[in-house]
Every structure is written in structure tokens, then in C-alpha cells.
Amino acid sequence: MTYETDDLRIESLNELSSPKSVREEIPISDEVASIVYNSRLALSKILDFEDDRLILIVGPCSIHDPIAALEYAAKLKVLQEKYKNELMIIMRVYFEKPRTTVGWKGLINDPDLDGSFKINKGIRIGRDLLYKINEMGLGAGTEYLDCLLYTSPSPRDPTK
């Protein structure tokens, strides 16, 4: 007799989109690639004391509303222009809530805020949001907590 003993509590499996497919679906333009690269380069120069501006990384704890995030980014862009000689403003764009043990886990994991866990949708929303923020000319910083965030552009060391 054969007994089913594996995966007894799994209701369904949903395959994650590959990084390649997400990048093909939401490609990065040369203009946005230049903004990302130059943001990373500027950050590196400030950290290496080659630029005396202060770095400000500001934004919400975790993004839950992409439209509100873009409105916030537009306001930061105005401040970035006003204080460009004194400050480098980077928008904090976190998609997960790693220290939350109960409740909503973040935009990537549950983009509809309803417990449906449409992770593929969340990945696309995240990448698209970072793209649009960079397209405004504003650098974006995120926290990499999970391999699911591998498809999102963000400022980091331009040499890597």
C-alpha cells in the first residue's frame, strides 16, 4: 500500500516570475539607468569624503500605496533641487515589513492588502515604482531582505 506523506498541508503552488521575465516586462531605459548609476556614484563620493554634501534617506516605513509614494517622491524632488548643493536626497522605498510578526507583510508579499499574497504582482509593482521614482530624477534606496527583490533597481556602489 502507498501512503501520501509529503506536502499534506500545501493547498497550491504559484511559480514566481523569473528575474529575466520581469526585467523584459519592465525594462530600464538608458535615461533611468544613467540616473541610477549617477545616484550611486554621487553616494560613493559622499561616503568617500570627495563630496561634502549630507546624505538624507527619507521616506515611509513601508510603501503601501504607489500613488501616494509617487506624490511623496515629487515633493522630495522639489527639495532635492532646492538643496542640491548641500544635500543628496534619496527616497527610502521599502517594500517589506521584516519585523512585523502579525499582519501585513508588505507590498511585495501582499500588494492588494487583503491576504491574497500575489507576490508576482507585488514584484512588478515594486520594480515599476522604483523605475518611476528614478525617472523623476530622484534616487531610491531599498532594503534587500528577500531574494524576491532582486529585480528592483536602487542606488548602491556603481562599481559592483
Short names for language-model regions:
Residues 63, 69:
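Metallocofactor- and cofactor-centric catalytic cores in central/energy metabolism, strongly enriched
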Residues 1-13:
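Polybasic, low-complexity association/targeting segments
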Residues 59:
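Conserved, mostly hydrophobic/aromatic
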Residues 76-146:
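A generic, well-ordered mixed alpha/beta core segment in the N-terminal half of proteins
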Residues 150-155:
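Conserved small/polar residues in nucleotide/adenosyl-binding loops
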